[in-house]
Amino acid sequence: MVRLTVALNPTSARTAQDFLDAFHFLVLGTRLESGCLGCSAWTDPDSTVHYVEEWLSEPDMRRRVRSEGFTSLLAILESATEPRVQFDFVTVTRGLDYVAEARTDASTGNARISRQ
């Protein structure tokens, strides 16, 4: 899985709502693309605007980066002041099995998961 994370702050020219509206427009089309696992946008209490895309594979993300939709995303980013952009390449995903493993007492081998 590959995750794109964007965070930006409002500028004197564009408000947080302006950025959020632009991102929401992208979310609708992005979610329909093959290989997209999810796409969302939101604003937190300090007015930072967040945009996240998750893709099944790196080839899916590469296809996305070459798309017209991504060109629209780049145009939004160019209107922001120092947007933070990060690509995370997730190679392992685990669930509660990891919690059980991590909480197992090494000396006894007993799991220490409380199920109250």
Outline where the language-model segments fall.
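Short, flexible helix/strand-to-coil boundary loops that buttress conserved ligand/catalytic motifs
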Residues: 53, 64-65, 74-77
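Short S/T/G/P-rich N-terminal loop/turn motif that feeds into the first structured element of a domain
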Residues: 1-49, 56-68, 82-116
